[in-house]
Amino acid sequence: MTTPLTASSPPAAPSMPSTPFAPTTPVAPADTSTPTGTPPQSAPAAPAPAPAPAPAPALTAPGFPETQVRARARLGTAAVFPDPTTYGSRLFGPENAPGPADALDRIRIVPPVFMPERLEKLIDLAREPEFDDVDLTTRIGGFTARLPLYLSAFGSTRAGSGDLAVHASRQAARLGIPMVIGENMVPVHGYRRTATKGGDTTRSALLARVEAYLEAAPDGVGGIVVQQSTEDADCEVWNLLYSDPAFRPLLDTGRLAFELKTGQGAKPGLGGMTVVGRAEAEELARRFTVREVFGADAPHQLRCAVPGTFTEEILSQQLRFMRNNFPKARTWVKFHPGRDIAHAARTAWAAGADAVTVDGAEGGTGWAPGVFLDQAGLPLAEALRRIGTPAGCLLATGRVWEGGRALRALALGARAVGLGRAALVAVDEDPAHGLRRLADALALELRLLISALGKYTPAALAPDDLWSPPPPFTPDPDPDPASDTVHGPFPAPAPGHPR
């Protein structure tokens, strides 16, 4: 009998059985009759106990493609394609992404017909190029990375400073990508190892992540970036790290960077926020502002960090201070998606920053007011448009989880993209391999897409590899009939397009 074809769109993440790709086998109904020669039972046997339900995930991420990320954390590169058991019985076509697409996701990737760079690669290889010939090795803020990815900053929030962050650190090291450690880790959790009542010692949250990364990091790739905000500066976090012998291997190999945090995409203009119990709030009140926003009888309080104050001159002086006082560490700076992001980025590069990170309004966080999550900050696509051709290393974060979104950011000028919520959800799904599988799937998509554009490195990508849908039509109040120029939303690449 011929299996009928169905015409359907591929799921955003393949719908997989619990055992990947195992075909479903019909189960015959149980025979309840008494076999010949068997005496009847006086009572039916007790049913076998039901299997214990799988533990519920520790993390949820509303508004984020959590289901698709978890599928990639389980299946790796297999999740890039539809379920192979449907091959031959289903016809596939495009499907809209789940949930509302932002401006970056609405951009189409547009391979050309004529590909001179593919011809150059063919001559170089003496054969037809394939997608495996794409080299994803990237220089990120002074580090060498195997992929144009890095692990975004997890700070002192509960989700970002526990065991999941340690698992993510270890897997990022094995992937050969840099890791950023977020703000307020030392003011909240301390720095040195602390003794327990039994005489054992426990590592601080920051050192636990550093040691997990160093234990798994290959030689010559990756690196650790440590953020500092106002409260961190009061604790002299960078001085502690720079003088700690534990960080000597990173300094000696040029794999340590310090990142000045000026803001974040999820709450631009505000400092970090966490929810703490009343006992912890009393301890933290010496360093942070604590507010009773949840009610006088609530067991929790809001801990707030100050955002810091920056002008063009203050930022320039801060970056020069970092370069002069910590000459062996790379200098990074992170901006929220402010309306003057282009001016801020140019100022940072002029002051010698090795990397400038822009965190789009789609970026995640451990805690923020809803009005900021929904209404504040520039979308990542607009922030990249305003920056235009970067004058140095530009890094982008904000809802990155798959290769298409990553490629759009790279084509708009970013050198690499950060994985934040996607990384935490992946290690929540599989603490040992989830992030690696997620990165493997993303890397495969990047190789496929970059080669389809007739290019073979991420640095070769440019805005003309993209097409943005036109805005709703509005009549031109002063049309120029002599002009037939089509104005797109993104600037044309400068000659050479420095990346």
Segment roles from a protein language model:
Residues L149-G155, V180-G182:
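Short glycine-rich or small-residue beta-strand-to-loop segments that form or flank ligand, phosphate
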Residues M1-A7, A54-R146, G160, R170, ...:
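Conserved, well-structured core domains of diverse proteins
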Residues G434-R499:
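Extended, intrinsically disordered, low-complexity segments
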Residues A58-D83, T230-V237, L241-A257, K261-L284, ...:
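Anaerobic metallocofactor- and corrinoid-dependent redox/one-carbon enzyme cores
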Residues A298-L444, F473:
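Glycine-rich phosphate/ribose-binding loops and adjacent secondary-structure elements
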Residues S169-R170, R174-F321, N325-A348:
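Active-site-facing alpha/beta catalytic cores
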Residues L151, A172, V356, A409, ...:
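Conserved, mostly hydrophobic/aromatic
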Residues L5-P57, P477-H487:
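Intrinsically disordered, low-complexity proline-rich tandem-repeat tracts
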